[in-house]
Amino acid sequence: MEAVVFVFSLLDCCALIFLSVYFIITLSDLECDYINARSCCSKLNKWVIPELVGHTLVTVLMLISLHWFIFLLNLPVAAWNIYRYIMVPSGNMGVFDPTEIHNRGQLKSHMKEAMIKLGFHLLCFFMYLYSMILALIND
Amino acid sequence: MSAPAGSPHPAASARIPPKLGGAAASGAAAPAGPGPGPHQQNGPAQNQMQVPSEYGLPPQNYIVPSGHYSQGPGKMTSLPLQSQSGDYYSGLYTVPTQNVATPNTASQQAGAQQMYGRAPPAPHAVGSTPGSFQGASSSASHLHTSASQPYSSFVNHYNSPATYSASSSVASQGFPSTCGHYALSTVSNAAYPSISYPSLPAGDPYGQQMFTSQNAPAVRPIRDNSFSGQNTAVSHPSPLPPPPSRQYHQQQSLSGYSTFSWSAPGLPSTQDNLIRNHTSLATASNPTNTVADSLSCSVMQNVQPPKSSPVVSTVVSGASSTRMPPAANRPVEPVASVTQPSELLQQKGMQYGEYVNNQASSAPTPLSSTSDDEEEEEEDEEAGVDSSSTTSSASPMPNSYDALEGGSYPDVLSSSASSPAPDPAPDPAPAPAPAAPQPSKMPKPFGYGYPTLQPGYQNATAPLNSGGPPSSPVYSGFQQYAQYPGMNQLSSSLGGLNLQSSSQPESLRPVNLTQERNILPMTPVWAPVPNLNLDLKKLNCSPDSFRCTLTNIPQTQALLNKAKLPLGLLLHPFRDLTQLPVITSNTIVRCRSCRTYINPFVSFIDQRRWKCNLCYRVNDVPEEFMYNPLTRSYGEPHKRPEVQNSTVEFIASSDYMLRPPQPAVYLFVLDVSHNAVEAGYLTILCQSLLENLDKLPGDSRTRIGFVTFDSTIHFYNLQEGLSQPQMLIVSDIDDVFLPTPDSLLVNLYESKELIKDLLNALPNMFTNTRETHSALGPALQAAFKLMSPTGGRVSLFQTQLPSLGAGLLQSREDPNQRSSTKVVQHLGPATDFYKKLALDCSGQQTAVDLFLLSSQYSDLASLACMSKYSAGCIYYYPSFHYTHNPSQAEKLQKDLKRYLTRKIGFEAVMRIRCTKGLSMHTFHGNFFVRSTDLLSLANINPDAGFAVQLSIEESLTDTSLVCFQTALLYTSSKGERRIRVHTLCLPVVSSLADVYAGVDVQAAICLLANMAVDRSISSSLSDARDALVNAVVDSLSAYGSTVSNVQHSGLIAPSSLKLFPLYVLALLKQKAFRTGTSTRLDDRVYAMCQIKCQPLVHLMKMIHPNLYRIDRLTDEGAIHVNDRVVPQPPLQKLSAEKLTREGAFLMDCGSVFYIWIGKSCDNNFIEDVLGYPDFASIPQKMTHLPELDTLSSERARSFITWLRDSRPLSPVLHVVKDESPAKTEFFQHLIEDRTEAAFSYYEFLLHVQQQICK
């Protein structure tokens, strides 16, 4: 059972890593002016909810399977994701808004955020991997 | 979706309005065609308008085989040339022949390098005779004088013609191209080869030298002066050095803003000298010379120094000695003299034209020109004509143009960074020593050089020279110089510093705000002038189009943070300009790496290369740029209009279009619901349109269309050939389609009759409508579909909340919260529908202008998104009614007139660039930011302002100037692709005091207002208000703790910031940010929209109205405008204490004028100006001043008219009696007074002081 949880977490984490990389690539494309803000934001906004769901799922799973440490580690990030999603003003087109992304250094902060998440997910990845192997061995 | 072909869409029915009469329904429906699909496909991609990254067509006109000249001697005869040149002048050009000739020559000379190689021979020709020399000098003097007139600084440069001439003679040497010519033509070919080779290498180094060796070369000219009245061959060697000096000059001038001090002081003397020399010389010289000179004068103003490198000089000296024989030329003296001027010219401007002429005139000598040359000349001529015509369009008279340009080449400035380091190294022996004495700051060896020359020249003794080019003479020259213009120059050289020191006291003078009772000046506040040297000041962009909040840019972000002041730009890029140089050329010269347009603040390293002032990359000067269409001269890249004007407009080539320029397309989307009909705007709009139909900007392709909507959407088929307009109704608002996509937007001229019919019919078509709903969203979608193939302007008239279909809105305003002091909600949009649509529109180059005429809440916050992101504009007429509210009706009428007839640019993009190290991070205005520095503007109008916030990313310690450039690429209504470029140059400072000294308080306030709007939308209004107060507190406390060492109990501010608290208080009481006073949400949002998109001048009046007392207008200090005397009453502070019952006051709030009449106002005034016998009989609502034939009435009216004319939108005039209820409107603008909810000015100061002390 334990192994299953971690296998799932591992896969989910992989997906999140890819997503983070995708965010970074797309944002840097925008930074370099390879794509315009509109298409960049519509691309990214599509993946905001999957990311949020994916991460919340792992977090909840850890809570259910009573892995407190991993749960607490994931909690702030999950909370941030949800907060960010909820706090989008009604007139905006999503977390990434093409009309504002170039203002007030938003692009940079988005980039920073994606980087941090990438690091976080990588960390999680190895933790899950380790835990999974441990679980498999224990089984 | 698509309508079935050939038959109306099921939902679409053709309705024939009574007025429209009998068009057959079938007819209407028949055309129903393909759905919207294709349109969209046609639509250009979003990226379309980006400026192509590559420009650079090779300059076609001027490519000439380099080998040309060498051929010359054998083939050619001068005669043909002469005849041609004669034709040129007389026939084609009013301009002197020499000028005319220039293009030809220019083309010939194309290969610069080769020219250099040839240079050495030139000395021969030059050296020949004193007589010739004189002639040359005279020409030079001519030039000088002519040049000098416009600008004093200029004169300095050239102070003494003599030097000039000397240098010029030298210059011929220095200037390879001419020299080459010369050598070939006149003297000895044999000499040529030997000499030429050495020179070639020189050419290469020369670039470097130019750059580095400023000091040394500069000195030389002086020396030259000193020595040589009559220069024989011996003298020549000396002349060689001068060319470097010139270069040097240029460089200095370029580099030099630090150095620039050369200004007026030296002038008088120099001028005298010039004149003297000139006359004497002229007499000496042949008549031909004089003629040539005079001709040349106009052309020649800016001379680029010949580029001989020091190396060259040495070589040359040798050569010159050998050349001595050239004296042989003398026999031909007249000729020689003639030629010399040309040489001079060449030296200066490298003007080949003259050169050619000279050659022609000097028939005897074999000249290099060939039959080939002739052909080329013709071609060039054409080119010349073209260019001249274009320039003439900008400014009819070339002369006036020059005046415009004003600065001659001294103006060409480079950032000091490039130039500052003197390097002796490149120079051969002579140079180094002189280099040292001249600090980079001492600017102008240039200016110096000339004066010194003169004396030398006059003396005509060569003693100094005897030594040849060596350094010693240089010294002497230098010293002389020092003595000579001495004081003047010193002072001028220190000019930059002086300016600072002189300006600082004033702008930094500590002001105790709490004790200064009358803080507001009596006259309008002008933008501070950046602390640059005179030449740069002259060249700098007008503050009306381009302003920076800090006219002294702090060196580092840390310094900026210490100052606690906002750093940003305020732009008004498309302002209506009375004078604008328009430039047509094949290649628009831009930096290869950062794509900056060439501008007055670049530095020319030599004639062939310029250094970008934003990224510091060294670029080549394209061949075409060497030719100056204004003066028709060649080789003066620094005199091109691009380099003489900080605001220019280019006609762009096809490189700058991704599709053919679009026609002007106007679509009117009109609300015709019951509410709208009730308000009655249709009558005014249609009337106004009918009147201005012919004045709509556009060409023969102009298209126009109409869409009306209530709960359904009505299209109008105006296809040419119909007997009457047909109305097509689409009731399927969930899935809007275009019934007849081809005939809804029609050519204005082909269908004019139908359009007029429709406009006449429209106001009465819906009089009996019962439809109260408004399907705005679907109507906009339809408009988008209609416009997307071409792009253009959509004018939307809306009178209520959209209540049907996509984009419907709910009322969000709670009237009870209007005067809440706590939270103001709903400042942001309720839905992203309008934003999305706006972005779609923006992608298709369509802008939506919103006219909101409503009496109730209409959620402007949401609707405005439509215009904000599509780069439209917003007009709001609260409680509009055509009879009940005549002042609004009149305002709409006048606004419409302006709106319909003002200039417009389509499919525009604006890019803002700034010097490396600075970066932009936030933009304010109506547009879509497409990439970090690129604003996408579907339309641009002359009333749109923008603001940009800047941060300093890298330290600017290695530069003393920063530049900002905005380039607005747009399609004019005539279908021309144009680029309007503004460049602003500002100094960098390292001390906090300087930063404070340079604050532009109005710009800072406007930028703060923009930031506060953002803050109140993204966060909350109270946050924004706090931020505003903190801005004052922080900046004043930072000033108090760092700069001012005066210990006062009061609140100390530098003089430059003394109005800061007042303006911030005004902002806090502005509709957009006020709390506690009942403010309707739409009013507030509209005020915010205006803050975002108004240019600074208009915004300032909104923030801080001007109050004048008008019952005692006098002609004292009056100005004359168009034969009218406009009195200029002093500004009064905005406080009730200034209002006396005996007076009448005019308050100018930007969009509204109030005239407040005191209770016991003089009856004479009331009678003379208002036309009523006494106070009691003045009506409550009065919006006009009668045209009475009395002096005071005339004065008052001319004053008000003058105020009105200064702004694009006509303000409404309200006459407010002291006791009328409307007076609260007036009194709420008295921002220095206390209101129930807000501080008085004094209280505010105390509050700030308290905060500082905390």
Curated annotation (Swiss-Prot), chain A:
Its main location: membrane. It is found in: Membrane; Endoplasmic reticulum; Endoplasmic reticulum-Golgi intermediate compartment. Disulfide bonds: none annotated. It comes from Bos taurus. Belongs to the cornichon family. GO terms for cellular component: COPII-coated ER to Golgi transport vesicle; endoplasmic reticulum; endoplasmic reticulum membrane; endoplasmic reticulum-Golgi intermediate compartment. GO terms for molecular function: CCR5 chemokine receptor binding; signaling receptor binding. Involved in G protein-coupled receptors (GPCRs) trafficking from the endoplasmic reticulum to the cell surface; it promotes the exit of GPCRs from the early secretory pathway, likely through interaction with the COPII machinery. It is a multi-pass membrane protein. InterPro entries: Cornichon (IPR003377). Pfam families: Cornichon. This is Protein cornichon homolog 4. Interacts with Sec23/24 complex components SEC24B and SEC24D. Interacts with CCR5. Interacts with ADRB2 in the early secretory pathway. The keyword Endoplasmic reticulum applies. GO terms for biological process: endoplasmic reticulum to Golgi vesicle-mediated transport; protein transport. Keywords: Endoplasmic reticulum, ER-Golgi transport, Membrane, Protein transport, Transmembrane, Transmembrane helix, Transport. The keyword Protein transport applies.
